Amino acid sequence: MARIAGVDLPRDKRVEIGLTYIYGIGLTRSKEILSKIELDPDTRVRDLPDNAIAQLREIIETDYQVEGDLRRFESMNIKRLADIGCYRGRRHRLNLPVRGQRTRTNARTRRGARQTVAGKKKAPSK
């Protein structure tokens, strides 16, 4: 079992895909890492030699910000925006879309499920 940056890579996947299980590494970055150490992307994780795993681990830990560090970095950026009181910070604080999307309709993902408001009571019919 290959464990890199605190994540167990799935054994049956290709290395190229397995690396994308690490937060902060997508397909493009995965290909970039594999080309650095000249490793075939079609190799399965279970077939990786120990020295290749060590090389992957070293490159990822030294050259890239992943997992907890990246999550902390992103949350600190959002907190900074909220602290300085800018428009984007307020939108984050209010759980509204940040990048100019409309909110009169849509924006359900960001705003959460609808909250029903009680309407007028119907008059009893005689």
Curated annotation (Swiss-Prot):
Record InterPro entries: Rbsml_uS13_C (IPR027437), Ribosomal_uS13 (IPR001892), Ribosomal_uS13-like_H2TH (IPR010979), Ribosomal_uS13_bac-type (IPR019980), Ribosomal_uS13_CS (IPR018269)
Region (Disordered): 100-126
Intracellular or extracellular location(s): Plastid, Cyanelle
Composition skew (Basic residues), residue ranges: 101-126
Chief place where the protein resides: plastid
Pfam families assigned to the protein according to its UniProt record, in alphabetical order: Ribosomal_S13
Alphabetical keyword list: Cyanelle, Plastid, Ribonucleoprotein, Ribosomal protein, RNA-binding, rRNA-binding
Family annotation (Gene3D superfamilies): 1.10.8.50, 30s ribosomal protein s13, domain 2
GO cellular-component term (any): small ribosomal subunit
GO molecular function: rRNA binding; structural constituent of ribosome
GO biological process annotation, one example: translation
PROSITE patterns in alphabetical order: RIBOSOMAL_S13_1, RIBOSOMAL_S13_2
rRNA-binding keyword on record: yes
HAMAP family: Ribosomal_uS13
Quaternary structure annotation from Swiss-Prot or TrEMBL: Part of the 30S ribosomal subunit.
Family, per entry: Belongs to the universal ribosomal protein uS13 family.
Function recorded in the entry: Located at the top of the head of the 30S subunit, it contacts several helices of the 16S rRNA.
Alphabetical list of PANTHER family matching this protein: 30S RIBOSOMAL PROTEIN S13/40S RIBOSOMAL PROTEIN S18, SMALL RIBOSOMAL SUBUNIT PROTEIN US13M
Protein name listed in UniProt: Small ribosomal subunit protein uS13c
Species name: Cyanophora paradoxa
Source organism phylogeny: Eukaryota, Glaucocystophyceae, Cyanophoraceae, Cyanophora
Name of the gene this protein is made from: rps13
